[in-house]
Curated annotation (Swiss-Prot):
Gene3D superfamilies, alphabetized: HUPs
Keywords: ATP-binding, Chloroplast, Ligase, Nucleotide-binding, Plastid, tRNA processing
PANTHER family cross-referenced by the UniProt entry: TRNA(ILE)-LYSIDINE SYNTHASE-RELATED (PTHR43033:SF1)
EC number: 6.3.4.19
Pfam families from the UniProt entry: ATP_bind_3 (PF01171)
Stated family: Belongs to the tRNA(Ile)-lysidine synthase family.
Subcellular location per the Swiss-Prot or TrEMBL entry: Plastid, Chloroplast
Originating species: Tupiella akineta (Green alga)
Chain sites annotated for binding ATP: 35-40
Protein's gene: tilS
Reaction catalysed by this enzyme: cytidine(34) in tRNA(Ile2) + L-lysine + ATP = lysidine(34) in tRNA(Ile2) + AMP + diphosphate + H(+)
Domain notes: The N-terminal region contains the highly conserved SGGXDS motif, predicted to be a P-loop motif involved in ATP binding.
Protein name per the record: tRNA(Ile)-lysidine synthase, chloroplastic
Amino acid sequence: MTNKLDCLKLINFIEKSNLFTTNKIRDKKLLIAFSGGQDSSCLLTIFYILSKKWGFKLGAVYCNHCWTDSPQSSLSAFDTLQMFDIPFYFVESPNSEPMKPEQKARDWRYSSFYTISKWEDYDFVLTGHSLSDCVETVLFNLFRGSGLKGICSLKEDQKFSNLKTNDFFFQKTVCFLDPFFYFSDKKGNPFFRKYRLFQSMSFLSIFPKFDFFAFGENCAIDKSNFPLKNKSKGKNLQFLTSFDIKNWFGIKKICRFCFLDKIGQTGIKKKRGTNRVPILIFSRRVNKTTSPLALNFQTKNKRVDRKSFLFRFSLAFALPLAFALRAKGEKVRKNALLNQIKPVSFFFKTKKDKTETNLFHRYLQTIKKLQNRDKISSFITIFRPFILTLGNVKIKGKKIKNKNLPFQIKKLIRKKEKEKGILWNSLSKLDNKDKLISNQIQKKGFKLIPKFILTKDKKSFSNFPPFIFDQLEKTFRKEKVDTKPRNSSPQFEVLFNKLSQPSSDKKNVDFIVFRPLIKITRETLFLFSNNLKIPIYYDKSNKDLNITRNYIRKVLVPLLKKINPRVEENIYKFSKIIEFYYQVFGDLKCPSDRFDIFNP
């Protein structure tokens, strides 16, 4: 294989796949399974470039199996994901223990994908399986004595219907409703109004570019770390969270969140029948002027109590809940309230080593301590990009857009953005055709609908435009009398029942996984990543030849390539032939006498 590769040609090849030609990807949310390796990094880069043209939304998920004590793989994945302005999810294995064997790790991984997809409303999950992975799976199953089903195991798209959400992800976390914050001061500082706060079953998070927050429960707090004033009034004590924020405008601020059960200093009264609790924020600029911002948050029949905790992870500080004094009905001045708080750093010490002072490294240490102390089964953390860095928002007169991406990737993004106008013009023409067809159906009446359906093949029925489905279903519902036509064929009855069924809830829809790179070899992806200078982490465990898959990848496949350099493509084509026969005839059982072998 030559060292030159046309990266745009490879991206266009992906764009010709069934996922794009059937227009399934338009206005969808895609979750990419990211491991930090070569295949998943190329997959993320390709779809990030194509998202600028097609307009779909991306997210990435990284699962930490804790197979090694070194956090290097997680750190490299975190550094790579920071380059892209997309939300990404970090999943820690239960109790931070190694997830073994391989089948158990796979089940846990796919169950995590399904859980996140269900929470965050993702339509598809994309994995980075390549043609080389398909070949290795075929050889692996052949060596184990598999039948037709094992040879054609890796498909371009696959449905999982028996997966269940991992309840242990959110058993011990506070569940908040969305949206979480309601800004009451519209004339307040624009920095806080630019924050977006997100809800999930496991974590509530505020996310600038490199900062995040997480709420949880059942965390013991050492009261000795939080000195209290006026202990005689301890009955009226309330919790107050305290942390520092570095404004991306270059202004340092000190923020205070007061969790109060009753009327706070803002004067906002709690309405009957609601679960809103007042929160106070005090901000201090460099010039020592203060301006309060009043916020409300809505809970789901829960209150923040002594067992709850708030984490804030940043490049400088991470502070726990602190106790603050507030007497009932007493008006406490802002400066006096600020002076009462003595925050204590609780989970890291600054070290000279760069990896030790890294934000994500400290986060990993904290998660392990929490799980060892509180026996939390598993943790999911959501990282979202700071809203000011999205689009063409001007900060200090400069545009922040794809700032950390390599130049080669930016160049391909600009090319795809130019194709965006042509794409939407063509799609609008298709929509107009769909509208014309549906209008003709409605004008000619219901009797012509069976003819229109029956002219389509049974296989192409599922590829019908969604707009037509909506129009047909509306037409069926308009018929108040017996909607089933007389002398209808059995084929039409099946289609009719399928159309007349109510739309199923999204929670019960099958979990769909796509493998867009299944027709591309690992060598081609290696050239693609080199040309675009994509950062890749090479896992040392892949060199262990005691693992069967590594032995096939490192020893057997290179030997077969010496016989025929295109052996991977031939094995892949062979598996597709077997897959075709399996779909037509099913899993054929061979007579036992065909397997008679002489054993000396």
